[in-house]
From Swiss-Prot:
Record protein name field: Mercuric reductase
Disulfide-linked positions: 136-141
Enzyme class: oxidoreductase
Cofactor note: Binds 1 FAD per subunit.
Provenance organism: Pseudomonas aeruginosa
InterPro entries cross-referenced by the UniProt entry: FAD/NAD-bd_sf, FAD/NAD-binding_dom, FAD/NAD-linked_Rdtase_dimer_sf, Heavy-metal-associated_CS, HMA_dom, HMA_dom_sf, Mercury_reductase_MerA, Pyr_nuc-diS_OxRdtase
Record flagged with keyword Transferase: no
A GO biological-process term: detoxification of mercury ion
Entry function: Resistance to Hg(2+) in bacteria appears to be governed by a specialized system which includes mercuric reductase. MerA protein is responsible for volatilizing mercury as Hg(0). Plays a pivotal role in mercury resistance under thiol-depleted conditions and cell protection. Protects cells under thiol-depleted conditions.
Ranges for domain HMA: 2-65
Length: 561
């Protein structure tokens, strides 16, 4: 039995809410909470995270500590927090009041901004209309990668390069159990990394409701519990994220189609799945469902990855088709009908029938309900907030970061933008440089890019040279018996400086950050080739690709330097 001490409860209803929150924590079998005693008794499975327990309570606005936690450890943790708060307060010594920062949203950009603003001495009011944590942890990056990993394991059990010595088998898929495992990890991370952190910081006030601008110095918040509240601010960050876009296809809105949110929450695997779209989300989920047992058809308006180097789309299309995924290029749905539990899609290549329909054609910024015009904030034609490198909007008091802006829609970009916005909102000067921004698509093989493609460089007037190394020249790929894909390096003609890398490989995401650092540090291709790379790693492919500018790597020994 695990015991918690809980402070802040004021009634038996508080205790009931705490009990409900604790019993949602993965690993908690039961909870007995007493308001008069200020305690909770928990039956938990071994390995249950103590941080998740305390975070669940903190998320409700109360404080929880393990009753049997070592006093010294508690003191150290408390002292560390006090030192942090005092250091922030020192930034605003004297009579100068702290900057009042309002943050709309609670995802990656919002959290990063709130925490950095507090470090800078600000008082933060964070406003969230839905579930704390935003898209990434709740319905995006985290659950999708868990599902993709499970699908990868199922695929390897069914088929691998080592089937000659390791007998293949058809796995039994229990989607409901996979979903429970997936959701447990999502809940754990949300408690530990969002709710608990917010609840444990006295400089952050969380308001649950929907915000809209009253003017350029205040917000009106329609509270989830009823009523309204006005929040005044010196600076405001809009970090409201984005939602799945829905194309105007006749009959679509009247049908029970899936977006990525519903697909990730489904406890069944459809026999037939049609996917409209060739976005990152569309392709990642298409392959995951196929590997878990669905017969998948992808409808791509153009080709896969048509904005990238053509070789990328060709490689992924070939990999999908090899797994039995049907890819219909240059195909659009002109009509959607749902009859007798079946979707019927009218397309430019005939009729398509499916049990479920996933629509993943991009994401739309969540800005329409904010009354941005009342604050003089400019948006583009898509509704995205227009910002500069400092995350400043057209209103000097209002900043924006993340998917609600015209920045690339990646959570790590959002978090970096949120941090820099907070610095600028509290009197600093920080800019976000995206010239060496790595991007990864978690298909198999993965797609990873950074910097210029050749076409992009030529568009900007840069003369280039390039080399493409197929993976049958990379020892790690040969040892894996999986040589699908390539690594392409793009250099600036004359200076020979590396300016872009595109990779399609089973672990391309693990090598692209090295390429990003090389570009960021303005390395030449020869300097990259001269570096030491561990033998039999996929990232060694970068060195080999760099060597191809001056020699034939097929004529080198295995680990020639």
């Amino acid at each position: 039995m695990t015991h918690l001490k809980i402070t802040g409860m004021t009634c038996d209803s508080c205790a009931a809410h705490v009990k409900e929150a604790l019993e949602k924590v993965p690993g908690v079998q039961s909870a007995l909470v007493s308001y008069p005693k200020g305690t909770a008794q928990l039956a938990i499975v071994p390995g249950t995270s103590p941080d998740a327990l305390t975070a669940a309570v903190a998320g409700l606005g109360y404080k929880a500590t393990l009753a049997d936690a070592p006093l010294a450890d508690n003191r150290v943790g408390l002292l560390d927090k006090v030192r942090g708060w005092m250091a922030a307060a020192e930034k605003h010594s004297g009579n100068e009041p702290p900057v009042q920062v309002a943050v709309i949203g609670s995802g990656g950009a919002a959290m990063a901004a709130a925490l950095k603003a507090v470090e800078q001495g600000a008082q933060v009011t964070l406003i969230e209309r839905g579930t704390i944590g935003g898209t990434c942890v709740n319905v995006g990056c985290v659950p999708s990668k868990i599902m993709i990993r499970a699908a990868h394991i199922a695929h390897l059990r069914r088929e691998s390069p080592f089937d000659g010595g390791i007998a293949a088998t058809v796995p039994t898929i229990d989607r409901s159990k996979l979903l429970a495992q997936q959701q447990a990890r999502v809940d754990e991370l949300r408690h530990a990394k969002y709710e608990g952190i917010l609840g444990g910081n006295p400089a952050i006030t969380v308001v649950h409701g929907e915000a809209r601008f009253k003017d350029d110095q205040s917000l009106t918040v329609r509270l989830n519990e009823g009523g309204e509240r006005v929040v005044m601010f010196d600076r405001c960050l809009v970090a409201t994220g984005a939602s799945p876009a829905v194309p105007p296809i006749p009959g679509l809105k009247e049908s029970p189609y899936w977006t990525s949110t519903e697909a990730l929450a489904s406890d069944t695997i459809p026999e037939r799945l049609a996917v409209i779209g060739s976005s990152v989300v569309a392709l990642e989920l298409a392959q995951a469902f196929a590997r878990l047992g669905s017969k998948v058809t992808v409808l791509a308006r153009n080709t896969l990855f048509f904005r990238e180097d053509p070789a990328i789309g060709e490689a992924v299309t070939a990999a999908f088709r090899a797994e039995g995924i049907e890819v219909l290029e240059h195909t659009q749905a002109s009509q959607v009908a749902h009859m007798d539990g079946e979707f019927v899609l009218t397309t430019t290549h005939g009729e398509l029938r499916a049990d479920k329909l996933l629509v993943a054609t991009g994401r739309t910024p969540n800005t329409r309900s904010l009354a941005l015009d009342a604050a003089g904030v400019t948006v583009n034609a898509q509704g995205a907030i227009v910002i500069d490198q400092g995350m400043r909007t057209s209103n000097p008091n209002i900043y924006a970061a993340g998917d609600c802006t015209d920045q690339p829609q990646f959570v790590y970009v959002a978090a970096a933008a949120g941090t820099r916005a907070a610095i600028n909102m509290t009197g600093g000067d920080a800019a976000l440089d995206l010239t060496a921004m790595p991007a990864v698509v978690f298909t198999d093989p993965q797609v990873a890019t950074v910097g210029y493609s050749e076409a992009e460089a030529h568009h900007d007037g840069i003369e280039t040279d390039s080399r493409t190394l197929t993976l049958d020249n990379v020892p790690r790929a040969l040892a894996n018996f999986d040589t699908r894909g390539f690594i392409k390096l793009v250099i600036e003609e004359g200076s020979h400086r590396l300016i872009g890398v595109q990779a399609v490989a089973p672990e391309a995401g693990e090598l692209i950050q090295t390429a990003a650092l090389a570009i960021r540090n303005r390395m030449t291709v020869q300097e990259l080739a001269d570096q030491l790379f561990p033998y039999l790693t996929m990232v060694e492919g970068l060195k080999l690709a760099a060597q191809t500018f001056n020699k034939d790597v097929k004529q080198l020994s295995c680990c020639a330097g």
